[in-house]
Amino acid sequence: MQVILTQDVEKVGRRGDIVDVSRGYVRNYLVPRGLAEVATPAKLEEARRRMEEAAERERRLAERAEEIAETLNKSVITIEARTGEDERLFGSVTAANIAEAIEKARGIHLDRRKIRLEEPIRSLGTHQVPVQVHGEIEASVKVIVVPKL
């Protein structure tokens, strides 16, 4: 029996999926718990339309992410950091600092968790920092850490 899942169901499918399951499973488990609804022709058409809209939305997001990645690959971000007499940093430059600098310089808001720093930057100079823009789309930003005067 075909049903449209209204929520993610373990070992069955994700929300919005159209799946074939046994009648007993539908009648005794999925429908009473509000996890699925029986797939009528009208509901199937509605679900297909929603899936097409989601695919289009995902395609637009991927296009935008490609543009952002291209911009980031060309970007050089300068971050000023406090240093001691021996040119060592007080503290470090973190992913949050880099995200803030990118937003100020390029107007691109990135979540700090998308910046793939294995360890915070603790030295002056030029560093290549990988950024996961969207899904599998990645970019590399050139970050220059200079002493604050």
Curated annotation (Swiss-Prot):
Signal sequence, start to end: none
CC annotations in GO: ribonucleoprotein complex; ribosome
InterPro entries the UniProt entry points to: Ribosomal_bL9, Ribosomal_bL9/RNase_H1_N, Ribosomal_bL9_bac/chp, Ribosomal_bL9_C, Ribosomal_bL9_C_sf, Ribosomal_bL9_N, Ribosomal_bL9_N_sf
Gene3D superfamilies: Ribosomal protein L9, C-terminal domain, Ribosomal protein L9, N-terminal domain
Pfam families for this protein: Ribosomal_L9_C, Ribosomal_L9_N
Domain of life: Bacteria
Biological processes, Gene Ontology terms: translation
Keywords, ordered alphabetically: Ribonucleoprotein, Ribosomal protein, RNA-binding, rRNA-binding
GO MF entries: rRNA binding; structural constituent of ribosome
HAMAP family linked: Ribosomal_bL9
Entry similarity comment: Belongs to the bacterial ribosomal protein bL9 family.
PANTHER family per record: 50S RIBOSOMAL PROTEIN L9 (PTHR21368)
Role: Binds to the 23S rRNA.
Protein's name in the database: Large ribosomal subunit protein bL9
